[in-house]
Each structure stands twice: as structure tokens, then as C-alpha cells.
Amino acid sequence: PAHHEICSLSWSALSLWILRGEYLMIQQIQLVLSPPTDVRIPQSWSYRLYGWLMSQISSEFGEQMHLQGEHPIAHFLCFSPEKQSLIWTVNLLNDAARQVVSPVLESAKEIPLHELTLPVSEVRTFPAVSAEELIRSGRSRSETRAKIAFLSPCAFKQSGRYTIFPQEALLLQSLIAHWNAAFPEYALIDPDALQALQQGLHIVDYNLHTTRYLLKETRIPAFQGNVTIEARLAPPLLELWNALLSFASHGGVGIKTTLGMGGAATDFYKKTPVI
């Protein structure tokens, strides 16, 4: 497929996508789980939940997904203090995943695992969104600061090693890679625009701790917490950055988002003046 560049010079391709009716949609579904009160469920159990999900869908879809190297599902598990329950957030990042996986999640009453069965007390299905809507959301925002919360263990891989601090370049590269995988028709490939984006981003605050994500027999070095990023960008690039941030809660950040890592949420706000 033809790639459309989104850069500092032009967003004109947007109207062309709208005329073509090319709305690639992604969707988020949350399952509120109610484990026994005396059982502590680690976040790494999202990998087991994913195993259950794969067992519920057609083997043909699963095989096709793995053969093509696609990762159309990003998910994570976290505890909600308000609900006093576990929330499994599952993001379906292409139309095939939405059609195949969403009926399984929406009809789930319980999830049997080897150790125990997790009752599903509530299913929340959020409206599907398109790249065009995320871009429009980016256009509507004028905030220059954003706080990214890493809700499940997050890590990057650089030169064959795990990196456990969210540098600006790694964050940007990860968000763009996930965006391009979900929206290949809207791929962000203009190197000049991407370099300008990177130069305008600065981490100005962070509250992080290191952790480990247990995956089979491997303990992956990772981090959790939050970072605040200030964007000093020309308006078209700020729109693009804000669109990527809006997408972060769907596509996740960093490596192994298909296996429960890199769950994220974003808050936008204006810079507080220094008195």
C-alpha cells in the first residue's frame, strides 16, 4: 500500500483518506476481574490471560497473526484502587482482531486459568477510533506538556540490551513503530519531521522505579511510574505529537506489548508558570 507522509509541511492527505472512506479502526475493551480476596495476582498474569484468549479464537487467525509477524493485540493487567479489582485492558489494533476477538471478550463470564478461575464482573467496550480521529484529537489540543503513566512494566531494547529508562528518542521511536503497525496507510516516515519532533521533546520530570516482568522463566528488566514531557514544537508537529500521545493508551509503549508489557495512559496539561 502507498504510504502517506505526515510532516510539518502538509496534512492534505487527510482529506484524501476521508474521501476514500479508509477508516482503519482500533478498539479498547476492559474486563473487570474479581479474584478471591486472599489471592494476589501479579501483573505478569496478563500473559496467562492472553494464552486463554488465544485458546478461544480460531487457530487459523492465531497462526496467521504469528506467521505474518503482526501484533494486532496490545494488553495489560493493573489493579484499580477505585474498583478494588483487577482490570484487564485489551486493545484490538486492526479490523480482523476486532471482528475475531471482541465477541470473545464481550461474552466472557469467567476466565479459567491453571491455578484458579477469574470471574469477570464487568465488560467495558469503548467506541472504536480511527487514525483520523486521533489526528483530529491532536489538532484540538494546545497543551505542551504531557504525563505518560506506565501502568504495566515497560522496557525498550537498544543494541541488543534492555533499556530501563524512557529516553525521549526511545519513546518517540516506540510510539511511531506502534502507530505505523496499526495504521500502515498513515505511516509516519518523513525523516526530517521525525528528527524535528525528537529535538523538540524534553523529559522535565519523572517518578520511576525499576521492576521485573516475569515471562515464562525470564525476568525482564523494566520500569514503572510516570514521566512528564514538554514539547517545544511548531504547531503541525505538536499536533502530530499529541496524536501519538493519544494513541499511546491503545498501542502501548516499548517492547512486548502483546505479552502484557508497556500499558500506558496519558494526561495533557499546560505548562505551569514559574513564580
Task: Give the ranges of each region predicted by the language model.
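Low-complexity, intrinsically disordered or signal/transmembrane-proximal segments
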Residues: 3-4, 23
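RNA-interacting cores
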Residues: 10, 14-275
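Selective for proline/serine-rich intrinsically disordered segments
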Residues: 1-2, 14
